[in-house]
Amino acid sequence: MRKKIWILLSFLILQVATFQSSAAIGDWKAYMAYSEVQEIEEAGNWIFVQASSNLYAYNRNDQSIQTFSKMDFLNDCDIQHIAYNKTAKRLLILYNNANIDLMNTQNWSVQNLPDYYAATITGDKTINDIYMYGKFAYLCYGLGIIKLNMADGEISDTYTLGFKVNWCEIRDNQIYAYSKEEGTYRAALSDNLLDRNRWSKVGTYTAPKKEDKSELMKLVSSLLPGGPKYNHFWYMKFIHNQLYTCGGAFLSGISLDTRPGTIQVLNQDNWTIYQDDIRNTTGYQYQDINCVEPDIHDPNHVFASGRTGLYEFTDGKLTHYYNKDNSILEAAVDRGTVLDNNYVLVHSLLSDESGKLWILNSQATHRSIIEMKDNQLIAHDQKTLNANGYSLSAMTGLMKDRQGRLWFVNDNHETPAIVCYQPETDEVKMFSKPFTNQDGAEINLYYIRCIKEDLKHNLWIGTDQGPFYITPHILDDTQSTLTQVKVPRNDGTNYADYLLGGVDITCMAVDQANRKWFGTSNNGIYLISADNMEQIHHFTATNSKLLSNNIESIAINDATGEVFIGTNKGLCSYMSDATATNEEMTQDNVWAYPNPVKPDYTGLITITGLSLDADVKIVSTSGTLVNQGRSNGGTYTWNGYDLKGRRVASGIYMVETATSNGEKGTVCKIAIIR
């Protein structure tokens, strides 16, 4: 009997295994850059490379490359220094936030050492240099030297000298601390180095002699570890089955740092880097690009914009550059002065089905909304959008709703605003201060950062005071009324809390289950249920693989459910359980993975390709119901347990589906091997 079961399983496994494998629900993935080599360390046959604040290793024997990230080996990201200890055979990985990992270079096992990261220290915690001596690492920081036992993985001593130590060394049984500010200090290794009085000044500052690693650099420069060119992802858009990204971070004179203008496009696991050596062509620095917009009809025809005007690319090459001198675009006005082409502010673009490109020209004397059709630019100047002698200074988030109206926001503290533009009538309506909620209470908004339409046609607004939403009926109102979702406390009182009240929302996306993903400036990312009443997930850099709590952009691959998350430390993704729906469920578009389910698999089994709110039943070959529920968008997940909480036995299980109105769909099969 057992033999017959395995023969049947083997036959059916051949049928179901034709479907490709997919990432499991809940999986995290990192897309890290490794282009800028910063430090190199040799460890036997391995060469460890710190590049773009990330880490990879090259094997001299077989020429293989191993990349490392927070997803699979490391405990953090954004590396400041690496250093190898030959005695302990461990690599010290120091992060910019002062966290420390110790990696065994024989098997990649990693020990986290968070003591220094968690320590409360008055002054600069930056590690300026690392010196290896025996099994110890000496870390030079703003107040002295930290002695770290690399073999035991613990901090042995801290020598508080009271001044910044730039580097140190040990020779002739003496330890030397070199400080640009205080000169050179020395103490005998046999002395009590914890006693500040044992250290004496012996001279002025001497710069260190750097080890010649030119040959290693030559070798490393030829390696191709993959990944994007930069870790900057201020703006992202998923379209044409590709992720289009740019670095951005500039809005109306507000920029935390200057970022390269490079456009990076992800297709599957392959990156295409658009031409970025264009300064000699345009005459201006190519940087601070905060919007990329592919032609809706042509994935290889792409527009980009930001601080210095509008750029047009075909097949990754620059074909046109539009500025104030060769087009109707206008430069920004600053304190009554019209600036040059270094400040032609175009923060948002939108390509529509009719072949038009819509352009927002911020802080300009006359311009605000511009239409491009057949390479011709047409101005739709709006006096409503002008204040202080120029247009709104940070117009961004351009989108089209299901009625064909254009919406965008002004992300500036002087005039935070929500704008609706109707192309057919060339009319604009702007909603600005004072804002009130549905109860008439005034909302003190400082920034309105983003706007998205959900599947029920509500328009969600991300602000520094949390998320709000409006309906298109607001166009008939004379007041700027925003709805704040109230979440009942369910504690026996009638009290409720505003949904993410006071949380600074920087970006958002709506998935195919009508759930909202909210990115924040310093609190990670939230997933809120379709009815807005439940917090499904709150991912932070502490409780998950999220790279950083500072979220700059979110984009979703609706076909797979992969949620791309751009942070200030790079790009990662989370495989969610909501995908695009199918109007009809057939054997060609409904399938399950992993399939077969092998004995060592303990994750969720995913059924995808379903219709919206599809009814799903999973039954055994004997007809016994083992699981049932409704889909999230086009996806349903099953943990492999029956209705009584028991793991199901080996066998073939039928997935029966029906639409939300009861019309039966298709049947797919799942093979489970225990």
PLM feature spans:
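Edge beta-strands of extracellular beta-sandwich domains
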Residues: 665-670
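Short, glycine-anchored, charge-dense loop/turn motifs used at functional sites
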Residues: 615-626, 645, 653
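Carboxylate-rich, polar loop motifs that coordinate divalent cations or form catalytic acidic clusters
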Residues: 21-590, 625
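Bacterial Sec-dependent N-terminal signal peptides
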Residues: 1-27, 356-358, 674
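Short, surface-exposed loop/turn motifs with a glycine/proline- and acidic-biased composition
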Residues: 70, 631-663
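A generic structural motif
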Residues: 325, 384, 632-633, 671
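Glycine-centered coil/turn sites that cap beta-strands in beta-rich domains
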Residues: 13, 584-617, 635-638
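Surface-exposed coil/turn segments at beta-strand junctions on protein surfaces, enriched
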Residues: 297, 352, 401, 600, ...
